[in-house]
A protein has these predicted regions:
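Hydrophobic alpha-helical segments at protein termini of multi-pass membrane proteins
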Residues: 1-208
């Protein structure tokens, strides 16, 4: 296994491992794998939609809408119906798996088409990979609230809205102002960590 391949797949898989391990009530391995692979497959329609709707990089922010909408559809129409999808943290786990499956295949596209693939792989491990992971966490958190807490459609809306908004804003500044891009990313990571921590505390209270 060469260095470029390791740099491409290791960052998303490490985050996947952390999210799965942090879940106090583990999910079936088979469903985790199929969800991750589904995220990979979503790259295909996403690429087609992005090529059609995004004429050049100045419109890259529109990718936030197409990509997060596809991830949301996967959670709503596939994950929601699974019997093992039975508590709020599950939504974060599967939301992150879909997002990082997507990010992994996308990583191959960017890294192996770059002039300096190792540099791009390292750069994306600190930018695009955390972006996708955190959007998955946030989407999952609010989707879990909708399914398991109150059936409030506002939470269903937030699930998609926040993911699209953060992703689109990140992409917008990525082509215009790198400093603001990193500020958006820091805010996104902080927000996602806070939501994940809330559900970890809730799980611990159920164990006691």
């Amino acid at each position: 296994m060469n260095l470029t391949l390791i740099l491409t797949v290791a960052p998303p898989l490490l985050i996947v491992a952390y999210i799965i391990k942090a879940d106090k009530f583990p999910e079936p391995t088979s469903l985790c794998i199929s969800t991750f692979l589904l995220g990979c497959l979503l790259c295909i329609p996403a690429a087609s939609l992005n090529n059609y709707f995004i004429p050049d990089l100045s419109y890259a922010y529109l990718a936030g809408f197409t990509e997060e909408s596809l991830k949301f559809a996967a959670i709503y129409f596939y994950i929601r119906k699974k019997t093992d999808f039975d508590e709020p943290m599950d939504a974060i786990v599967y939301g992150t798996l879909i997002s990082l499956g997507f990010a992994t295949l996308e990583n191959f596209q960017y890294v192996y088409n770059a002039g300096n693939p190792d540099f791009i792989a390292i750069l994306r491990s600190f930018t695009a990979i955390p972006l996708h992971a955190c959007c998955g966490i946030i989407m999952g958190y609010y989707f879990g609230l909708y399914i398991f807490k109150d059936r409030n459609k506002l939470n269903l809306f937030k699930s998609l809205f926040f993911a699209i908004s953060f992703h689109a804003t990140y992409n917008y500044f990525a082509t215009r102002n790198v400093l603001l891009m990193f500020i958006v990313l820091i805010i996104l990571i902080s927000f996602a960590r806070k939501l994940h921590k809330l559900l970890k505390i809730e799980q611990l209270s159920k164990q006691n």
